[in-house]
Amino acid sequence: MMELEGEKPNYGEPRKYDPTFKGPIYNRGCTDIVCCIFFIICILGYVAVGILAWSQGDPRKVIYPTDSRGQFCGQAGTPLETKPLLFYFNIMKCASPMVLLEFQCPTTQMCVEKCPDKFMTLLKAYANKEDFKYYKNFCKEGLEGLTVTQILSSGLCPAMLTPSKPFTRRCFPALDQKKGGEITVGNNSKFDDGEGNIRDAKDLVAGVKNATVVIEARQVVMKIFEDYTQSWYWILIGLVIAMLISLLFIVLLRFLAGIMVWVMIVMVILVIGYGIFHCSMEYVSLKSEAGSNVTLKDLGFQTDFSVYLHIRQTWLAFIIILAIVEVVIILLLIFLRNRILIAIALIKEASRAIGYVMSALFYPLFTFALLSIVIAYWAVTAVFLSTSNQPIYKVFNDTACDHSRKICEPANFSTSSMKAECPDSKCLFAFYGGETVYHKYLIGLQFYNVFLFFWCANFVTALGQMTLAGAFASYYWALVKPDDMPAFPIFSSLGRSLRYHTGSLAFGSLILSIIQIIRVLLEYIDHKLQGTQNKCTKFLLCCLKCCFWCLEKFIKFINRNAYIMVAIYGKNFCTSAKDAFFLLMRNMIRVAVLDKVTDFLLFLGKLLIVGLVGIFAFFFFSGRVKAFENTAPNLHYYWVPILTVVVGSYLIAHGFFSVYAMCVDTLFLCFLEDLERNDGSAERPYLMSDRLLKVLNKKNKPEPAE
């Protein structure tokens, strides 16, 4: 095969032959000590933030609805334990625009055992002993001896009750729409508001709409949560299947690398082809169904995502996307057919290396465990930080009042000057906040939590990359395998990485984290400016997002290769990054031909596993296989477990294939150095395998006869 020679512009001097070099250097010192110390200080600060958040936060604010006194409805061990639902005295006041600003209706709210199920006014209920007994379930205490007028003026009871249903632990009027568009509540289109006025049921719509706008998304979240509770067992089975397929694939790749790569290529084409066929059949079958020709634009956003599967345009979009992917893959395979042979040789060599370092296959489990700890710590800290505010009470009034929306204290509000100047006003719970130093810098603590999450997650990933790189480099540079390799390559490499190079790992992950935080901020700004019509701003923001996306990919590439050089030579991060970059630039053509084609083949492997498990999950959860029709759980959205299984399968496959990818990258960098250090002579023989020598049209010259 034709030799692949890369151009060698001025990117530093090629590596010179060193007879003492035997692979990863053992006599090394600590690198990037300043960054190591800074990282440790930041971790200690992160622990302090967590302790502070846990001491101030209260997750009950997320779980339970809160009444006008700031008490939690339905909380165990409190007087409100048996009253889990929140009841609004006058739901129509929720039509105020203030609801959208402060997420709070300007009406009294109290915890109740169950929602009202009948029409009733205080005036009529007061005259009937049984009715008034029922009515008092929705009133405050202290009604004895008071007249109807006194009760209403004191705000102890609502003027009326309407039939309601619980929704996200809140009582909302049981509105219904009959044929012709007539709105009813409790089968009535008119009702008495308790103040002598006959109101239309449509008047309740605005209040309910505004009251639910803040929690509308929670309906979807709650349904998704219910789906998870119904399907978690089957999701785990799907993920276990993905893990077993990934493990089987890796084992087969170890012994049958060449055959498995070609089988993988053919299978990917067939799986995507089947996807196109299935989508086409669905598209044709919907032709005769009424309403299936509605466009996605006309349909708009629907919380019930299964609606989209009854639209022909959805399946047409799937067909187009899959067809494009199929064509792109086939074209790449045609144009890269010769390069694929070289990449297969590199994968075979990686398989051989993994055969000597079998423990590397299980290292992703260690990385996964560390990442789980990081994610769990971040999530718990975020919840406690977001719930560490104190209840804030504000003045609410139906009429004009100078003190409206001002902060008040419910304990002494009845005797305050605010109440005297605004007799109709009420001091109600508004939201959670605070004026202390802690609350003033709360947003800073939340930002610190997010930033340290990115930094720690990237550090864990970097540790895995350097550990695997050190283990596989010790394999490559061993003259006699496995005699010249450490007894436990993974543990030896992990120990070196933590003992000497924590600073370098922290430095590289810090750079990447800063870029990721900037990308998050750009996404946040983009979300806030969605309504703007300034095209220049949109264009600038789009350019910045694109540039930082490219920069993140570049930094990940540099970091990955820098960690390999640190693992081998034990130099600091910047020097290693420069050496790796120059080495790759001196061999640009080989990088494009070998490394990237190999990455493409490994990506096809991940795609195959995701496709197989995804197809199985689709037919199971959608109930399209009669054998499993009664076994599959009944779900609101069957795409929830399908999507979870697909994403989880990709992450699992990525975890297993990341070992191969890191092995390939390490061997690739090592054999580039091998080509520069050695020339194949008896004094300077190549250390790469005979298979790679043959692919690259290189050979070691025999020792001269004596």
Swiss-Prot record:
Q: Which GO terms describe its molecular function?
A: antiporter activity; choline transmembrane transporter activity; ethanolamine transmembrane transporter activity
Protein name in the entry? Choline transporter-like protein 2
Q: What membrane topology does the annotation report for this chain?
A: Multi-pass membrane protein
Please provide, in alphabetical order, the Gene Ontology terms of the cellular component aspect for this entry. Answer: mitochondrial outer membrane; plasma membrane
Query: Which segments sit on the Cytoplasmic face?
Result: 1-32, 254-256, 337-364, 478-504, 621-638
Q: Which residues are glycosylated?
A: N187, N210, N293, N397, N412
Q: Does the keyword Secreted apply?
A: no
Q: Name one Pfam family in it.
A: Choline_transpo
Function in brief: Choline/H+ antiporter, mainly in mitochodria. Also acts as a low-affinity ethanolamine/H+ antiporter, regulating the supply of extracellular ethanolamine (Etn) for the CDP-Etn pathway, redistribute intracellular Etn and balance the CDP-Cho and CDP-Etn arms of the Kennedy pathway.
The protein's matches in InterPro entries, at most eight in alphabetical order, are given as: Choline_transptr-like
Q: Which reaction does it catalyse?
A: choline(out) + n H(+)(in) = choline(in) + n H(+)(out); ethanolamine(out) + n H(+)(in) = ethanolamine(in) + n H(+)(out)
- Family to which the UniProt record says this protein belongs: Belongs to the CTL (choline transporter-like) family.
State its location(s): Cell membrane; Mitochondrion outer membrane
Keyword presence, Ribonucleoprotein: no
Q: Which gene encodes it?
A: slc44a2
